């Protein structure tokens, strides 16, 4: 029981020292920094240029598609690394499992590729124009509305 409290106590002391370090650094920098606000310092700074327009701009959805595909394959590597470190004791069954896992991801990538979601500039469809419809003859005695 005493050893358990000692272990929790050391974790508590470590967390307390971490909080004190962060708060102490923040307070020290706040006390030592000069504070002379003026309109030029309070203006928005963007790479040395005056900000033009709103910061809320619409990004092309393809940026998000590329980012999502990157995250999917990044997570795949996170799952494959532990598997690769203990591959020999797991045997053939583990190899088949990881091949199925990678195959599902590759099928998803192939589907996105074939669908055209990975193309940065999508081609515009070439739809032929239909010739105008000929006017139908009007029966005798029927009135035409113009």
From Swiss-Prot:
Cellular location(s): Cell inner membrane
Membrane topology summary: Multi-pass membrane protein
E.C. numbers: 7.1.1.-
Chain segments annotated as transmembrane: 8-28, 63-83, 93-113
Enzyme class, broadest EC rank: translocase
GO molecular function: NADH dehydrogenase (ubiquinone) activity; NADH:ubiquinone reductase (non-electrogenic) activity; quinone binding
Signal peptide annotation: none
Subcellular location, principal: membrane
Keywords, alphabetical: Cell inner membrane, Cell membrane, Membrane, NAD, Quinone, Translocase, Transmembrane, Transmembrane helix, Transport
Catalysed reaction equations from the record: a quinone + NADH + 5 H(+)(in) = a quinol + NAD(+) + 4 H(+)(out)
GO CC annotation terms, alphabetical: NADH dehydrogenase complex; plasma membrane
Keyword Cell membrane (UniProt): yes
Function: NDH-1 shuttles electrons from NADH, via FMN and iron-sulfur (Fe-S) centers, to quinones in the respiratory chain. The immediate electron acceptor for the enzyme in this species is believed to be a menaquinone. Couples the redox reaction to proton translocation (for every two electrons transferred, four hydrogen ions are translocated across the cytoplasmic membrane), and thus conserves the redox energy in a proton gradient.
Subunit organization: NDH-1 is composed of 14 different subunits. Subunits NuoA, H, J, K, L, M, N constitute the membrane sector of the complex.
UniProt-listed HAMAP family: NDH1_NuoA
Family to which the UniProt record says this protein belongs: Belongs to the complex I subunit 3 family.
Protein name in UniProt: NADH-quinone oxidoreductase subunit A
